[in-house]
Amino acid sequence: MTENEQIFWNRVLELAQSQLKQATYEFFVHDARLLKVDKHIATIYLDQMKELFWEKNLKDVILTAGFEVYNAQISVDYVFEEDLMIEQNQTKINQKPKQQALNSLPTVTSDLNSKYSFENFIQGDENRWAVAASIAVANTPGTTYNPLFIWGGPGLGKTHLLNAIGNSVLLENPNARIKYITAENFINEFVIHIRLDTMDELKEKFRNLDLLLIDDIQSLAKKTLSGTQEEFFNTFNALHNNNKQIVLTSDRTPDHLNDLEDRLVTRFKWGLTVNITPPDFETRVAILTNKIQEYNFIFPQDTIEYLAGQFDSNVRDLEGALKDISLVANFKQIDTITVDIAAEAIRARKQDGPKMTVIPIEEIQAQVGKFYGVTVKEIKATKRTQNIVLARQVAMFLAREMTDNSLPKIGKEFGGRDHSTVLHAYNKIKNMISQDESLRIEIETIKNKIK
């Protein structure tokens, strides 16, 4: 990369980071690469699904950086992984395989879902370690963390990561013997082979894999069928002894897999255990920003933030909400999804879901004011003495954390402030909490009083 290209690209990244939320930047921009700038055309490598976002949101960024560095209008040519792989794949055709061919082994269908990749997995603080471990395993299967055990509640991305690992390994080594399977289906296959008296086929199928991806391993603990856990134990040992990678997911930690044999639990803890927790507000906004690219509707920012505030337990609820909205919008022939339209569309889903305690913003303001010795009137006003500013920002932080109100709505309740003011207060307090233990305790104390 030439010096001008480096300056240009650094400026693009700087402008993008200043305009986007951190989680959105991490997902859509962080992994993009500038390949070259030639004849006023910037060739940028990125994941294909992110092209539309760049076209919609970053065109001005590229134009600005172009005029600053080259004093010219820079257009963009996006290239994708598939384009870069053509030459590499052609080279691989003429190369000898690194491992001995296994033509004598039965064919294995991977059952991977090709739509899941690391590129379209939204990262946040709640899943960062799980993603890092998954990428490490995909890069060097059988050597880094074996087994890798990922646990967390439903709809948080465990299945996505399993498939992303498999797809990444398959892209690098098309001859790899990979199997994605749920524990329930493993049990079903075991039963079928027992009945047909073809257990040797099952053993040959699973014990000669390069990568075994087992989803919802807790299902194995529920089964009392004689021999099921024994067969999985032997499969695990055969693979692990041959340095073949095993990745498992569960809705609980290995130690809480009741009715599972101790020797299996022990083996599950040989490698690395990582947890995924529900996405925070910023990550939910980033997830929605990504998902709405699949729909031909306009989602204003306040609608996205409203939806992010409505569902905080898992990603599936967010995806389901978008499908509900799409149905209503198509029926009404609406292009722009307002907060009112979104609220109408998800009403039934909210009624079916867990009931949330509605916390008035006024209650938050009152409790914060009482704690810091200021009035609600002062919190809503413009006075900027230190104790009032802190109370105001803490109240805004808690209003965003503890209610499903959009940023504009919260701002309105704080003397008609702009949504950007609320966002600034939220980010500032969030950052302060990470560095100031006493402030974190203060806010937890206020939270407990509000609840």
Swiss-Prot record:
Q: Name one GO molecular function term.
A: ATP binding
Query: Is Membrane tagged as a keyword?
Result: no
Tell me the superkingdom of the source: Bacteria
**Which of UniProt's keywords are assigned here?**
ATP-binding, Cytoplasm, DNA replication, DNA-binding, Lipid-binding, Nucleotide-binding
Q: Which GO terms describe its cellular component?
A: cytoplasm; plasma membrane
Task: Identify the Pfam families for this entry.
Answer: Bac_DnaA, Bac_DnaA_C
What is known about what this protein does?
A: Plays an essential role in the initiation and regulation of chromosomal replication. ATP-DnaA binds to the origin of replication (oriC) to initiate formation of the DNA replication initiation complex once per cell cycle. Binds the DnaA box (a 9 base pair repeat at the origin) and separates the double-stranded (ds)DNA. Forms a right-handed helical filament on oriC DNA; dsDNA binds to the exterior of the filament while single-stranded (ss)DNA is stabiized in the filament's interior. The half-life of ATP-DnaA is 12 minutes at 37 degrees Celsius, in E.coli the half-life is about 41 minutes.
UniProt name for this protein: Chromosomal replication initiator protein DnaA
Species, as recorded: Streptococcus pyogenes serotype M1
Q: Quote the gene name from the UniProt entry.
A: dnaA
